[in-house]
Amino acid sequence: MRSPVQVTILGSGDAFGSGGRLNSAYLVESAGATFMVDCGMTVLQGLKRSAIDPERIDFVCLSHLHGDHFGGIPFLFMDYLYESRRTRPLTIYGPPGTEQSVMALFSALYQRQSLDPLPYPVSFVEIGHPGRTVVQGVTLEAFAVPHVSELVCYGFRFEVAGRTIVYSGDTGWTDDLIARTRDVDLFICECSTFETQLDIHISYPEIAGRAARLTCRRLLLSHLGSEPLRRRSEITLDLAEDGMVISL
């Protein structure tokens, strides 16, 4: 029997494709909705390697406007135009500036197509923090995370079909993540570095040293950079893999 919620890791890598991994993208499926969390440049490869029709996506949630997290949206648009022939609406949720950034990128990559109206309705919804909304039975809550000062950057908490998922987005460590992930079913946490300590990303020692304080039912490290991949034999926490499917 199918689990109430399935999460497919479409991309578990960082901006540099470390280890040959794809950019950040996660698909959440339930009986009521199918949605994507982040949409990196390699999203179509991730979807098609997992034999997932891009047209199944009801809405997209973007954590912040770095290319490895939103750069795949124009490629989705192109797939919907020429491959899956989408006709139903698509909604994209994201921080302030999402519509302008997405459409500017679409224009830069596919000049002619960006000038014509898309044959399916696309709407952009800017979410604030704290921002809480319900979409197709999914409760979406955005919260601010400390990543880069020039952008509004979010983590997300989702309540879907009786399950709870927290996604850190890109962030430096903050103890707010301990409270945000209390008793959730799945916490997908970025882990970009190992020996390098940064204010804008989490290192493996930082998360490993706090793992005992986390009460989430499952912790999964993602957005993996070259350092944690090179030192994988020293890592005891679960690592995401491209194509991994998690049943909740």
Please give the residue ranges for each predicted region.
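Binuclear metal-dependent hydrolase catalytic cores
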Residues: 1-166, 232-248
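Active-site flanking residues adjacent to catalytic metal/cofactor-binding acidic residues
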Residues: 37, 63, 169, 189, ...
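Short beta->alpha connector loops
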Residues: 41-42, 146-149, 171-174, 225-227
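Cap/insert and terminal regions of metallo-dependent hydrolase folds
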Residues: 172-248
